[in-house]
Amino acid sequence: MENIEQRVKKIVAEQLGVNEAEVKNESSFVDDLGADSLDTVELVMALEEEFECEIPDEEAEKITTVQQAIDYVTAHLDK
């Protein structure tokens, strides 16, 4: 079973059409990986589906890097 970090990075790579090797923890979805606002919405939806959790819009707006996505999922997965 892949850990949360690997799963998040895989989803980011798939959603943004980038090589998984380019997806670093500190990568910004917009600045480093070329995401636009629609990409980020789709990314949040993919994370919600993968981890069976709901990410409210106000929280989703704060998730701008790969590490923030990993941290959010990790913090909310057990709830």
From Swiss-Prot:
* Reported modifications of this chain: 4'-phosphopantetheine is transferred from CoA to a specific serine of apo-ACP by AcpS. This modification is essential for activity because fatty acids are bound in thioester linkage to the sulfhydryl of the prosthetic group.
Q: What is its main location?
A: cytoplasm
Q: PANTHER family, from UniProt? A: ACYL CARRIER PROTEIN, CARRIER DOMAIN-CONTAINING PROTEIN
- What is the protein's given name? Acyl carrier protein
Its lineage opens with: Bacteria, Pseudomonadati, Pseudomonadota, Betaproteobacteria, Neisseriales
Instruction: State its location(s).
Output: Cytoplasm
* Protein purpose: Carrier of the growing fatty acid chain in fatty acid biosynthesis.
* Similarity remark: Belongs to the acyl carrier protein (ACP) family.
Pathway in which this enzyme or protein is active: Lipid metabolism; fatty acid biosynthesis
Tell me where the transmembrane regions lie: none
Can you give the residue ranges of the Carrier domain? 2-77
Species of the source: Laribacter hongkongensis (strain HLHK9)
Q: Which GO terms describe its cellular component?
A: cytosol; membrane
Keywords of the record: Cytoplasm, Fatty acid biosynthesis, Fatty acid metabolism, Lipid biosynthesis, Lipid metabolism, Phosphopantetheine, Phosphoprotein
